[in-house]
């Protein structure tokens, strides 16, 4: 598989008018293979298993929010970077998940070929399926290099997507609290 991938990169370099045997490009096919192997490593992991490994009984019934989880992914249409942040909240229903598992889950989904809308839904669904909370809220804000580097070339444009479940849809106060918290000042100093 690696050899086939590297040969494809060599062919691509040749097609665009480059010499894959010149000094700066000799190891490029191998480097690109390793980069893509890492950038798509999310296919080798199950986010629901990661979440399920750290479930704890809790009487907490207030919002748990982890915001500003930075990520990068690859657009499935152009294989160009998506760079952004995710805000994830849920209202427990007898169980909480270990905090480190939320960014791990985000990374698993981000390290797949993606569209932002799908990734937002996948994160919400995984939390909903594994911990069965009273509600889930996910907001993803990202820059898409397929928009900035080609096509319309709109540098610094951002896309925001959301997925709301349970009480985040049904209860306007919960929804307001969530959006208020994720929009409060971002810098925290301890």
UniProtKB/Swiss-Prot annotation:
Zn(2+) binds at residues 75, 78, 146. It holds the Pfam family GTP_cyclohydroI. It catalyses: GTP + H2O = 7,8-dihydroneopterin 3'-triphosphate + formate + H(+). GO terms for molecular function: GTP binding; GTP cyclohydrolase I activity; zinc ion binding. Signal peptide: none annotated. Gene3D superfamilies: 1.10.286.10, 3.30.1130.10. It is an enzyme of class 3 (hydrolase). One of its GO terms (biological process) is one-carbon metabolic process. GO terms for cellular component: cytoplasm. Keywords: GTP-binding, Hydrolase, Metal-binding, Nucleotide-binding, One-carbon metabolism, Zinc. It comes from the Bacteria. Coiled coil: none annotated. Its EC number is 3.5.4.16. Pathway: Cofactor biosynthesis; 7,8-dihydroneopterin triphosphate biosynthesis; 7,8-dihydroneopterin triphosphate from GTP: step 1/1. Homomer. Belongs to the GTP cyclohydrolase I family. This is GTP cyclohydrolase 1. It comes from Campylobacter concisus (strain 13826). The gene is folE.
């Amino acid at each position: 598989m690696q050899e086939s991938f590297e040969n494809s990169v060599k062919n691509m370099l040749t097609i665009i008018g480059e010499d894959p045997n010149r000094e700066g490009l000799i190891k490029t096919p191998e480097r690109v293979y390793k980069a893509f192997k890492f950038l798509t490593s999310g296919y080798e992991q199950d986010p629901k298993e990661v979440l399920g490994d750290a479930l704890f009984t809790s009487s907490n019934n207030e919002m748990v929010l982890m915001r500003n989880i930075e990520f990068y992914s690859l657009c499935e249409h152009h294989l160009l970077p998506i760079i952004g942040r995710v805000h994830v909240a849920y209202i427990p229903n007898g169980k909480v998940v270990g905090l480190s598992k939320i960014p791990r889950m985000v990374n698993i989904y981000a390290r797949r070929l993606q569209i932002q809308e799908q990734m937002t839904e996948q994160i919400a669904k995984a939390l909903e399926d594994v911990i069965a909370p009273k509600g889930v809220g996910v907001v993803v804000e990202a820059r898409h290099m397929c928009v900035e580097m080609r096509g319309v070339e709109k540098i610094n444009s951002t896309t925001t997507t959301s997925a709301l479940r349970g009480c985040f849809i049904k209860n306007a106060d919960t929804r307001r609290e969530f959006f208020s918290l994720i929009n409060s000042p971002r810098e925290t100093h301890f």
